[in-house]
Amino acid sequence: MTLFPYTTLFRSSKKFESTFLGLTIPQNDSVMFGSLSGDKLGIWVAHGEGRFYLPEPEDHYNVIAKYNYAEYPGNPNGSDYNVAGICSADGRHLAMMPHLERAIFPWQNAWYPADRRNDEVTPWIEAFVNARQWIEERAFKK
């Protein structure tokens, strides 16, 4: 049995691309993304691979991030079900193609809401805070 029953392939455009686009975080119980459920956030993609090939129906996967559009260029990889991120059933292991670490600060974003320009960090930081808290809760148990 594999950790993730999927394969990643070269993107449909068959070339390296770097662009800023939107993701939706569906309801999920993953360690890093659970608290972001329902959010729509901007993010960078920068790679030539990463097209999720998902041969089973979508509900067979623990999808934690989806591109806002199903077609190119909004789904730059051509991923099935416009999936941008997926995680293991227990929520601990994440596979994601966009680069959330490149969208942590508002100045890194190609667009950021005017009414939030005073933010020191974007909501993406929450994924890293969640991971740290998860580790701390388990590392210091007696």
Predicted regions and their residues:
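Single conserved hydrophobic/aromatic residue that forms the stacking wall/gate
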Residues: 1-8
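Amide-donor transfer/coupling interface in amidating biosynthetic enzymes
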Residues: 10-142
